[in-house]
């Protein structure tokens, strides 16, 4: 029988299905997380107090978890290996184009809808993150992902890397507007935090969580479980292990599961030259967009 995982003081649990999928049936973010944080603001178990605990203590505690240690070691090794970042940054900057012009040229009404959604969603998400008080990194290009999901009406979307859930919220909202499609997400919680599973997807609205297929063991374990189940993938968003080897592994793993028309979005392509090398080797069109000093690569449109 699949075990239950109770995520700390926020109360409702996530039920593990199979070997790592999380069937998210109980909403615990947005209004409820804000209420919980307010009620516990002064208590010893508050999220603010959790955030102040030693990073090293949390690293050690999570390293003792058998399913965490191998992934942690791979991530630490990748960060210690200096990437060819300057070369990648120069290439991305040289090839960048305006995402506004791109979106408006394909479908002005849908691009306007995407911007309207993002303008409403961003302050709500920021409010949740401010209340939590835990650094969860930046999100993907959620405006672009909403737009692409609405534009292409994918049957199956795969994303690697969830964190707070900016991109997940964009895709799930757009799929709901489309009236069909499913999202399969692979993540590995921030191991510097205590009980890090509680924060994964924390900005995703409660109403969008039913049927969200979320796996939390890292890409190498998650993709082995997701790919036989999800069907052919029409939209793939890569935003997890940014190392050269990590990107190579993921693309090799999903290659035979992508539809011929699959749209591929890769975040942080300026971290190393993987995206440049990949698109030049495969041939065909590609696009590069700048966002907040970082760069996103797109293939398929």
Summary of predicted features, one role per range:
Residues 20-23, 60, 106, 125, ...:
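Prokaryotic Sec-type signal peptides and long signal-anchor helices
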Residues 95-99, 105, 115, 121, ...:
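Alpha-helix boundary/capping residues
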Residues 23, 27-115:
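Membrane-proximal basic amphipathic "stem/tether" segments
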Residues 1, 21, 27-30, 55, ...:
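Intrinsic disorder/low-complexity signature
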Residues 105-139, 150-151:
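Class I SAM-dependent transferase core
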Residues 3-6, 12-14, 19:
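Intrinsically disordered, low-complexity segments enriched in serine/proline and basic residues
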Residues 43, 131, 135-301:
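S-adenosylmethionine/decaboxylated-SAM
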């Amino acid at each position: 029988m699949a075990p239950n995982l109770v995520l700390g003081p926020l109360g409702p649990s996530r039920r593990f299905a199979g070997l790592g999928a999380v069937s998210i049936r109980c909403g615990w973010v947005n209004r409820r997380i804000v209420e919980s944080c307010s009620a516990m603001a002064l208590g010893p178990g508050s999220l603010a107090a959790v955030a102040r605990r030693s990073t090293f203590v949390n690293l050690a505690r999570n390293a003792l978890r058998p399913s965490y240690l191998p992934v942690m070691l791979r991530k630490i090794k990748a960060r210690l290996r200096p990437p060819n970042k300057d070369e990648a940054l120069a290439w991305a900057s040289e090839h960048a184009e305006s995402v506004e012009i791109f979106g408006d040229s394909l479908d002005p009404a849908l691009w306007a809808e995407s911007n309207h959604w993002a303008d409403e969603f961003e302050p709500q998400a920021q409010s949740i993150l401010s209340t939590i008080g835990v650094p969860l990194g930046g999100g993907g290009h959620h405006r672009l992902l909403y737009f692409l999901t609405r534009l292409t009406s994918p049957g199956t979307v795969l994303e690697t890397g969830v964190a707070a859930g900016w991109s997940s919220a964009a895709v799930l909202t757009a799929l709901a507007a489309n009236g069909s499609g499913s999202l399969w997400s692979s993540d590995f919680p921030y191991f510097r935090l205590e009980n890090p599973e509680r924060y994964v997807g924390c900005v995703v609205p409660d109403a969008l969580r039913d049927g969200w297929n979320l796996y939390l063991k890292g890409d190498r374990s998650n993709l082995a479980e997701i790919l036989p189940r999800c069907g052919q993938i029409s939209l793939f968003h890569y935003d997890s292990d940014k190392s050269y080897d990590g990107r190579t592994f993921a693309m090799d793993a999903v290659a035979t599961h992508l539809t011929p028309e699959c749209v591929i979005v890769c975040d942080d392509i300026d971290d190393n030259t993987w995206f440049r090398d990949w698109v030049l080797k495969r041939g065909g069109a590609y696009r590069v967009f700048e966002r907040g000093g970082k760069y996103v690569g797109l293939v398929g449109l």
